[in-house]
Amino acid sequence: MILGILSDTHGDTDAVKRVYAALPNADAWAFLGDGQREANLLEVMSGKPVYTVKGNCDAGDIAEEQVITLGGVRIFMTHGHAYAIALNSYRLMLRAQELDCAVALYGHTHVSEIEYAGGVQIVCPGSPSVPRRGRRKSFAKLEIENGSAMASIVAL
């Protein structure tokens, strides 16, 4: 199973189209906030489930965090700003452990990275629209097989 992961499109519908074109075989998508309209577009384009959380720039009644289980892997989703993710991933890691999740996904920083801490794989897809800290436009994918998950960053 392949989960496509993106965040922080901030109104850039062309970015969503580029992401989908780069990963048309995704079985589902995680959209980590700051682009609810683009999350809706992705769902229409792909015809696949799109799990979303609310970003600090989103309005409306959207969950601020969510736990999903795919292929036997528990995945914690949040935008990240409520966990001071711009400083470090420690609070995010603790929340994922508390929820018994093997993977934590976040956005907000616009900086693509994958790290491992406290038995949790922590993934930020960066931004396909406005990346920061010299990173390229990007998204991430999570490949799930036999109850384990492996993330990678995909540059656009």
Predicted regions mapped to residue ranges:
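N-terminal active-site segment of His-dependent metallophosphoesterases
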Residues: 1-48, 58-64, 135-138, 144-146, ...
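Conserved beta-strand segments of alpha/beta enzyme cores
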Residues: 2, 49-51, 74, 121, ...
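Active-site neighborhood of phospho(di)ester-bond hydrolases with catalytic His/Asp-centered motifs
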Residues: 5-7, 28-34, 51-55, 77-79, ...
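Active-site environment of divalent metal-dependent phosphoester hydrolases
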Residues: 10-14, 36-40, 57-62, 83-87, ...
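Pre-active-site segment of Zn-dependent metallo-hydrolases
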Residues: 11-22, 77, 83-96
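Binuclear metal-dependent phosphoesterase catalytic core
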Residues: 17, 70-71, 94-100, 123-156
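Short acidic, glycine/proline-enriched helix-loop-strand junctions
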Residues: 48-49, 114-129
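Helix-adjacent hinge/juxtasegments
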Residues: 49-90, 99
